[in-house]
From Swiss-Prot:
HAMAP family: Gly_tRNA_synth_beta. This is Glycine--tRNA ligase beta subunit. One of its GO terms (molecular function) is ATP binding. It catalyses: tRNA(Gly) + glycine + ATP = glycyl-tRNA(Gly) + AMP + diphosphate. Pfam families: DALR_1 (PF05746), tRNA_synt_2f (PF02092). PROSITE patterns: AA_TRNA_LIGASE_II_GLYAB. Keywords: Aminoacyl-tRNA synthetase, ATP-binding, Cytoplasm, Ligase, Nucleotide-binding, Protein biosynthesis. The keyword ATP-binding applies. It is found in: Cytoplasm. Coiled coil: none annotated. Belongs to the class-II aminoacyl-tRNA synthetase family.
């Protein structure tokens, strides 16, 4: 079957830059879906996305849909014929199929007609496939234009559809298909004739349009890095900003611009924020990570006088930097702590009080937590009291991303200790999955306190997160607490910290069972964390059964159990623990704590008792040092005496004293393993 390249390009007014790449991918996916449904094969595909166009190239597409057959079943044979004569049901089926009854297959249990459907020409199928793909694009809000009733993300301007070197005759979104595209708006305003689909990219390149999103992105990234190096700096190129800039230009030309050095007195985060978010510039840092008074803009034109473009961008950015400078100077006119007065009128949550109320709670809770993790209570309390002050500043009002960062600079300006200042920013860490953690113990204490206060407060008024709604980001808060404690190796008993947080709210929350509810929610987040790490859920549950209060201790136990499961003795010992657990659960009355050797009547009882005593002495110091892996490795040596015991000894002996003593022996055995985890749950 012959095949030809196919090209479709829809020209529009400027498309939303943040959505451009996803629109292109969705356009291709929709076309592939349509081609597959039509049974059309092809050898390759490529999507192109530029500010004024979406295009897809399909390589070596079948020019003819293959013929196919479908079987249509009719009535059962007993209903189709009576006394050898066709019934009305049989005749009706033949009429429905448009054939004589003689052409119907009568060899099976039912009448069957095999209908041959000849394939259609691909050119006749493509308009519907393209139209369906465009209709299925993820466009939140479509628009109409002029007198047209058509709707799309932006008004359409032209349409190219070529199968081989032939135009596919159709009209889509008010545009009649042809072979004429358009070049760069300034460099090549004339139409561009696309000779063949394979020449599409090069035809547009000659017209100063780089249609390939990936090519433009790579060019911008490479040229920006080169220019930064020439300025003895490194460019800040966030992937999302690079994508957005790529979507804004058809013919990218990066240029170096500058601003007055006096603006460097403003916190560089504020300058970077305004230049990235508002102007789409790439900022430059020196070797020490300090902002340079230069930036890179990406022009969409190759100017004969690039200085004009540079000066224009420098003129545009100056007022924005001046605003940031003004806010910074205004805020510094008063001590940071005085901004707490404004927060007394800002509601955190209607039932839980103001933002200032929250800051006071965080201060006390941070002071409680700090010494427990090796920090300073006084400095943590001070940082907690200042933690929300910058929310009332002019800087954060203009640049919300500066919360915490602004507080850091203002605290330093007021002469606060370095760790107190850092904690004002670190309280929000981690800001996302895998993001940076607090570096100071003061910051860690405030970050944990802030998150626990939110968890306890919101749970305490019954606003639990649902599957789809978590307006206070409680899941992220819980994961943040766990990450700080585990990855920073901070041994904090969360039970005490959560109970302290509950008491602070007083009558504002329903305290009964609240601490337990919050702790369960926090430790439940560990399940997903471990699953992501490839740790089996049974390992998590074996530790969860003991309900450790420390996240660090919990993690150390999980890692130990995971290592234990790789030992050859693990499976058998897990099964034995399960058997012992079942036996002990059926014991009548309390199980004795002491084992009495005088009731032994089998050598294997003595052997197991001796092995348990030796293991107990060995693992006690290990348990005290939380050497859980070593402890389980030592307990693995109990497999042989345990197996011998169960092969030779009937636990439920007729003699009540002998039976009770054997229960006590098995309880000692199980207690050794429970010092780490309930490995009976591993079976």
């Amino acid at each position: 079957m012959s095949a030809q390249d196919f090209l479709v390009e829809l020209g529009t007014e400027e498309l939303p830059p943040k959505a451009l790449a996803s629109l292109g991918d969705a356009f291709l996916a929709g076309i592939e879906k349509g081609l597959q449904a039509a049974g059309l094969n092809y050898t390759g595909k490529q999507v192109y996305a530029a500010p004024r166009r979406l295009a897809v190239l399909i390589r070596q597409l079948d020019v003819q849909q293959p013929d196919r057959s479908i079987n249509i079943d009719g009535p059962p044979m007993q209903a189709a014929f009576k006394d050898g004569e066709p019934t009305q049901a049989a005749l009706g089926f033949a009429k429905k199929c448009g054939v004589e009854l003689a052409e119907i297959d009568q060899s099976g249990a039912k009448l069957r007609f095999s209908q041959h459907i000849p394939g259609k020409a691909t050119a006749s199928l493509l308009p519907t496939i393209i139209e369906d793909s465009l209709n299925d694009l993820p466009i939140p809000k479509r628009m109409r234009w002029a007198a047209s009733r058509e709707e799309f993300v932006r008004p359409t301007q032209w349409l190219v559809m070529l199968l081989g070197d032939q135009v596919v005759d159709c009209t889509i979104l008010s545009q009649k298909a042809g072979r004429e595209s358009r070049g760069h708006r300034f460099h090549h305003p004339e139409n561009v004739v696309i000779t063949t689909p394979a020449n599409y990219v090069e035809d547009l390149r000659k017209a100063y349009v780089l249609a390939d999103f990936a090519e433009r992105r790579e060019l911008i990234s490479k040229r920006t890095a080169e220019l930064a190096m020439q300025q003895e700096g490194t460019a800040i190129v966030p992937p999302a900003l690079l994508d957005e800039v790529t979507a804004l230009v058809e013919w990218p030309v990066p240029l170096v611009c500058s601003f007055e050095e006096r603006f460097l007195e403003v916190p560089q985060e504020a300058l970077i924020t305004t230049m990235q978010d508002n102007q789409k510039y790439f900022c430059l840092l020196d070797s020490e990570g300090k902002l340079l008074p230069r930036f890179i803009t990406v022009a969409n034109v190759e100017s004969r006088d690039p200085k004009q473009i540079v000066q224009g961008n420098e003129k545009v950015v100056r007022p924005r930097l001046t605003d940031a400078e003004f806010f910074f100077k205004q805020d510094k006119k008063q001590p940071l702590e005085t901004f707490n007065e404004r927060l007394k009128n800002v509601v955190f949550q209607a039932q839980l009080g103001t933002v200032y109320d929250k800051a006071e709670r965080v201060s006390k809770l941070a002071a409680f937590i700090a010494p427990l993790i090796g920090g300073d209570a006084q400095r943590a309390g001070r940082a907690g009291l200042l933690s929300k002050c910058d929310l009332a500043t002019e800087m954060v009002g203009e640049f919300p991303e500066m919360q915490g960062v602004a507080g850091y600079y203002y605290a330093l300006n007021d002469g606060e200790p370095q760790d107190v200042a850092l904690a004002l920013n670190e309280q929000y860490m981690p800001r996302g999955a895998g993001a940076e953690l607090p570096q100071t113990l003061t910051g860690a204490a405030v970050a944990i306190a802030d998150k626990l206060d939110t968890l306890v407060g919101i749970f305490g008024i019954g606003m639990l997160p649902t599957g789809s709604k978590d307006p206070y980001a409680l899941r992220r808060a819980a994961l943040g607490v766990l990450r700080i404690l585990i990855e920073k190796q901070l041994d904090l008993n969360l039970t005490g910290a959560v109970e302290f947080a509950v008491k602070q709210f007083g009558a504002k929350v329903k305290a009964a069972g609240l601490a337990e509810q919050v702790l369960e929610f926090i430790f439940d987040r560990l399940r997903a964390r471990y699953e992501d790490e490839g740790i089996d859920v049974a390992t998590y549950l074996s530790v969860r059964a003991l309900q450790p209060g420390s996240a660090l201790d919990f993690d150390q136990r999980v890692q130990a159990v995971q290592a234990f499961r790789k030992l050859p003795e693990a499976e058998a010992l897990a099964a034995v623990n399960k058997r012992v657990s079942n036996l002990l659960s059926k014991a009548e009355g309390a199980i004795a704590e002491q084992v009495e050797p005088k009731y032994f009547d089998n050598a294997n009882e003595f052997s197991l008792y001796s092995a348990i005593q030796q293991a107990d002495q060995a693992v006690q110091p290990m348990a005290a040092a939380r050497q859980y892996s070593e402890s389980l490795a030592r307990l693995a040596a109990l497999r042989d005496p345990v197996d011998a015991f169960f092969e030779a000894v009937m636990v439920n002996a007729e003699d009540a004293k002998v039976r009770a003593n054997r229960y006590a022996l098995l309880s000692r055995l199980r207690g050794l393993f429970l010092g780490v985890a309930d490995i009976s749950l591993l079976g």
